Swiss-Prot record:
There is a cross-link at residue 133 (Glycyl lysine isopeptide (Lys-Gly) (interchain with G-Cter in SUMO2)). Tyrosine phosphorylated. Phosphorylated on Ser-90 by TSSK4. This is Outer dense fiber protein 2. It comes from Rattus norvegicus. The gene is Odf2. SUPFAM superfamilies: Myosin rod fragments.
């Protein structure tokens, strides 16, 4: 193996559920010396700490007697192309240690190449899905742009409708004004006649009032004269009293007649005001009715326009919904493809992780089997050594019994250790059998999972066939749509050519119409200028009429004031007359107080005369104002008649010109609307044709790309399924072969263990029989020794008795060989 001092150690800590792929360069075949060196190094080499998803139960390996504990000694597994060293982890840190040079295989390289291919294919599918998502986003953006365009169009339509309503309102106002002017012109003649009649009535009433006022003034003058005479004459006669009473009665009559004339004048003025108010109310009512009729017509027209716009909006919404449905189907297909891809990826990763785990577990089982083989070989060597030692012991037993006793005790201890080790081995074998059963159950679970995966693969294949059928149906629908669009294109091209011919013909007929229209515009401008002049004249006349009306209202107010003052004067006069009557009736006897009363009456008469003079002046001013107003009204009536005649003539001309202009405008509007509609229809159809062509090209490209992607995905899926099947079958075969090998090895180890147990039992029996023989021999030798000692003692006693105690006996005892042969105490 290579020198690993140059490369530093690499420690990787990963979660338990994440699979780890380790790529390591392949090493040359290791030599025996290098393997021994690497075995001695242990944890000092370049190692990788990999936390596996499945924790392996780490046990302390069995150590033969006479060696130290191998808790931190690594296990080694060698193969001609590979080498693997594993240091069992401590109980505190369950971390498996692997060498970087022990996991490099050609299968891993091929698997990683396949994984890279799968990743590339997945990236291509992700790119395709991203393209589809971007296209869906583009379609969403186009839909949002279309919605915004529709909203802008709606706002423009609302603005246009508002402008149309304003223009229509202005037109209605202008029409109402023109109609009012016409009605005023029609009603002026009747009003003139009615005014003349009212003027005559008012003049007659005013003359009557003036006459009554003059008569009252004469009566007042007569009263003044009589009062003056009474002043000069201190005594009143019966004639004077009669004249006073007559004059008073005449005054009362004149005042009553004046009151009646004033009442009639007030009634006439009230009737006139009521008539004017009723006429105004009728005019306002007619105008309101006309406005209501026009508003109803405009409302109906706007409702029709709104219905048309609602229909267009509904059609556009239906198109948008169709596009949304298509986008939803596309997004659902993309989501299903993504989910299928993710599911397949997850399954592939899970299966690869399970395969890697199974490979690691199989390698661990092989290592444990190799360890068991090494331990069995060590046990066999130990048994051979024990046999050799037994032979040696047999040879040495003959030489020294005491040494055999000590060795027998040692051998008994060693036999006890062997019994303990055999019990441990039995436990280890039972654990190995339990692990084998667990591996068999796991293998059965893997087989079941494989069956489930095969069922899922069948379901996925069915789903792929369904998707292919759906794609074929979509392609057929797209072909049908494309054929229908091509037919529409042909129709629209034919209609476009017809519209072009009609447009050229209309353009040819449009030039003379433009000349006529320019002439009509000039005439309309002239008429508008004349109409503006007439409108200015009419406004001036209206202002003058309003001024005269205001002046008439002021005069009527002044007349009402005069009436009120006259009433007040009449009331005061009545009160004074009644007081005078009472005074005359009560104070006829008291003639002494007449001068005071006369003075008071003279003062009151002077005040009344002053008031009458003021009223006369006011009457004169009012008559002058009324005469001025009459002259102004007559002059304005003449002007109004002239203006009416001119206006009627201008109206006739305006009507004729407006009829001509309306006809020309209608024709122009019809032609312009037709041209605009034709141009819009042509532009829309060209845009629709262009968009349809672009959509056809895009959809054909999308269909082609999707078909290619589906074919490639289906082929890749089939290849992957076949490869996974082949890999699973090969792995199953390898696992079955390994399991069979392990079972054969277990059976061999079991037979070897049975043989070892039998040999051990035989050895124990032989050893015990030999021990019994040795014990028997020892007892025999002891008995012979005792008998010999007894015999020697007998001889001693006999020699002592025969020869007596002397030096001869002592020397004889020291030199006797039997004494030397006896074992030391």
């Amino acid at each position: 193996m290579k020198d690993r001092s140059s490369t530093p150690p690499l420690h990787v800590h990963v979660d338990e559920n994440t699979p780890v792929h380790v790529h390591i360069k392949k090493l040359p075949k290791p030599s025996a010396a290098s393997s021994q060196k690497s075995h001695k190094r242990g944890m000092k080499g370049d190692t990788v700490n990999v936390r596996r998803s499945v924790r392996v139960k780490t046990k302390v390996p069995w150590m033969p007697p006479g060696k130290s504990s191998a808790r931190h000694v690594g296990c080694k597994w060698e193969n001609p192309p590979h080498c693997l060293e594993i240091t069992p982890p401590s109980s505190e840190k369950l971390v498996s240690v692997m060498r970087l040079s022990d996991l490099s295989t050609e299968d891993d390289d091929s698997g990683h190449c396949k994984m890279n291919r799968y990743d590339k294919k997945i990236d291509s599918l992700m790119n395709a899905v991203g393209c589809l998502k971007s296209e869906v986003k583009m379609q969403k953006g186009e839909r949002q742009m279309a919605k915004r365009f529709l909203e802008e169009r709606k706002e423009e339509l609302e603005e246009v409708a508002h402008e149309l309503a304003e223009t229509e309102h202005e037109n209605t106002v202008l029409r109402h004004n023109i109609e009012r002017i016409k009605e005023e012109k029609d009603f002026t003649m009747l009003q003139k006649k009615h005014l003349q009649q009212e003027k005559e009535c008012l003049m007659s009433k005013l003359v009557e009032a003036e006459m009554d006022g003059a008569a009252a003034a004469k009566q007042v003058m007569a009263l003044k004269d009589t009062i003056g005479k009474l002043k000069t004459e201190k005594q009143m006669t019966c004639t004077d009293i009669n004249t006073l009473t007559r004059q008073k009665e005449l005054l009362l009559q004149k005042l009553s007649t004046f009151e009646e004339t004033n009442r009639t004048l007030r009634d006439l003025l009230r009737e006139q005001h009521c008539k004017e108010d009723s006429e105004r109310l009728m005019e306002q009512q007619g105008a309101l009715l006309k406005r209501l009729a026009e508003a109803d017509s405009e409302k109906a027209r706007l409702l029709l326009l709104l219905q048309d716009k609602d229909k267009e909006v509904e059609e556009l919404l239906q198109e948008i919904q169709c596009e949304k449905a298509q986008a939803k189907t596309a997004s659902e297909l993309s989501k299903s493809m993504e989910s299928m891809r993710g599911h397949l990826q997850a399954q592939l990763r899970c299966k690869e992780a399970e395969n890697s785990r199974l490979c690691m577990q199989i390698k661990n089982l092989e290592r444990s089997g190799n360890q068991h083989k090494a331990e069995v070989e060590a046990i066999m060597e130990q048994l051979k050594e024990l046999k050799q030692k037994g032979d040696r012991d047999k040879e040495t037993l003959k030489k020294a019994i005491r040494a055999q006793k000590e060795r027998a005790e040692k051998s008994e201890e060693y036999a006890e250790q062997l019994h303990v080790q055999l019990a441990d081995k039995d436990l280890y074998v039972a654990e190995a059998l339990s692990t084998l059963e667990s591996w068999r159950s796991r293998y059965n679970q893997v087989v079941k999972d494989k069956g489930d995966l095969e069922l899922e693969i069948i379901v996925l294949n069915d789903r792929v066939t369904d998707l292919v059928n759906q794609q074929q149906s979509l392609e057929e629908k797209m072909r049908e749509d494309r054929d229908s669009l091509v037919e529409r294109l042909h129709r629209q091209t034919a209609e476009y050519s017809a519209f072009k011919l009609e447009n050229e013909r209309l353009k040819a007929s449009f030039a003379p119409m433009e000349d006529k229209l320019n002439q009509a515009h000039l005439e309309v401008q002239q008429l508008k200028a004349s109409v503006k002049n007439y409108e200015g004249m009419i406004d001036n006349y209206k202002s003058q009429v309003m001024k005269t009306r205001l002046e008439a209202d002021e005069v009527a107010a002044q007349l009402e004031r005069c009436d009120k003052e006259n009433k007040m004067l009449k009331d005061e006069m009545n009160k004074e007359i009644e007081a005078a009557r009472r005074q005359f009736q009560s104070q006829l006897a008291d003639l002494q107080q007449l001068p005071d009363i006369l003075k008071i009456t003279e003062a009151k008469l002077a005040e009344c005369q002053d008031q009458l003079q003021g009223y006369e002046r006011k009457n004169i001013d009012l008559t002058a104002i009324i005469s001025d107003l009459r002259s102004r009204i007559e002059h304005q009536g003449d002007k109004l008649e002239l203006a009416r005649e001119k206006h009627q003539a201008s109206q006739k001309e305006n009507k004729q010109l407006s009829q001509k202009v309306d006809e020309l405008e209608r024709k122009l509007e019809a032609t312009s609307t037709q041209n605009v509609e034709f141009l819009q229809v042509i532009a829309k159809r060209e845009e629709a044709i262009h968009q349809a062509q672009l959509r056809l090209e895009e959809k054909t490209r999308e269909c082609g790309s999707l078909a290619r992607q589906l074919e490639s995905a289906i082929e890749d899926a089939r290849r992957q399924v076949e490869q996974t099947k082949e890999q699973a079958l090969s792995k199953e075969r390898a696992a079955q072969s390994k399991i069979l090998d392990l079972e054969t090895q277990l059976s061999r180890t079991k037979t070897e263990l049975g043989q070892l147990r039998r040999t051990r039992d035989d050895v124990d029996r032989r050893y015990q029989s030999r021990l019994q023989d040795l014990k028997d021999r020892l007892e025999q030798s002891e008995s012979t020794n005792r008998s010999m000692q007894n015999y020697v003692q007998f001889l001693k006693s006999s020699y002592a008795n025969v020869f007596g105690d002397g030096p001869y006996t002592s020397s004889y005892l020291t030199s006797s060989p039997i004494r030397s042969r006896s074992p030391p105490a």
